[in-house]
From Swiss-Prot:
Catalysed transformations (reactions): S-(5-deoxy-D-ribos-5-yl)-L-homocysteine = (S)-4,5-dihydroxypentane-2,3-dione + L-homocysteine
InterPro entries per the UniProt record, alphabetical: LuxS_sf, Metalloenz_LuxS/M16, S-ribosylhomocysteinase
The species this protein was found in: Haemophilus influenzae (strain ATCC 51907 / DSM 11121 / KW20 / Rd)
EC identifiers of the protein: 4.4.1.21
Record's function text: Involved in the synthesis of autoinducer 2 (AI-2) which is secreted by bacteria and is used to communicate both the cell density and the metabolic potential of the environment. The regulation of gene expression in response to changes in cell density is called quorum sensing. Catalyzes the transformation of S-ribosylhomocysteine (RHC) to homocysteine (HC) and 4,5-dihydroxy-2,3-pentadione (DPD).
Oligomer and partners: Homodimer.
Gene transcribed to yield this protein: luxS
Needed cofactors: Fe cation
One record GO biological process: L-methionine salvage from S-adenosylmethionine
Name of this chain's protein: S-ribosylhomocysteine lyase
Cofactor: how and how many bound: Binds 1 Fe cation per subunit.
Length: 167
């Protein structure tokens, strides 16, 4: 099985909240695709609650599109990481970390503006596979934490995992 790029970075050196360009690709037709690691929590020290990350998934995807999509950028997907320390965002385009960070902070402000559970998009049995597994309160706490701590940048060259540690 090939070793995925996400496992070639040293998680003990990651800062959070922080943006990292995880991967860039050029499609056969010449489109740039960028995958971002949006790290909310310090790996192995903090974790997002299941209900909080699920609610954030419903809110964050739309808010990030509101703040980041434009003529040269289109978000393909924003998905929570299995380790529950952040999200991966794949998009067409090449925004820099600062632009992504600004959109992320604005999105966290938007999350705080959601006043009640009924305002969470797609929160119903038809559009959500675990529609009872949500917490707006937890999502608000996550957003407050990101805003209070600020968003830094993780660089791949600073996180390169020593080959002796690759398994």
């Amino acid at each position: 099985m090939p070793l995925l790029d996400s496992f070639k970075v040293d998680h003990t050196k990651m800062n959070a909240p922080a943006v990292r360009i995880a991967k860039t690709m050029l499609t056969p037709k010449g489109d740039n695709i960028t995958v971002f690691d949006l790290r909310f929590c310090i790996p192995n020290k903090e974790i997002l609650s299941p209900k909080g990350i699920h609610t954030l998934e419903h809110l964050f995807a739309g808010f990030m599109r509101d703040h980041l999509n434009g003529d040269s950028i289109e978000i393909i997907d924003i998905s929570p990481m299995g380790c529950r320390t952040g999200f991966y965002m794949s998009l067409i385009g090449t925004p820099n970390e600062q632009k992504v960070s600004e959109a992320w902070l604005a999105s966290m402000q938007d999350v705080l503006g959601v006043q009640d559970q009924a305002s969470i998009p797609e929160l119903n049995i038809y559009q959500c596979g675990s529609y009872t597994e949500h917490s707006l309160e937890d999502a608000h706490e996550i957003a407050k934490n990101v805003i209070a701590r600020g968003i830094g940048v993780n660089k791949n060259e600073d996180l390169s995992l020593d080959n002796s540690l690759l398994k």
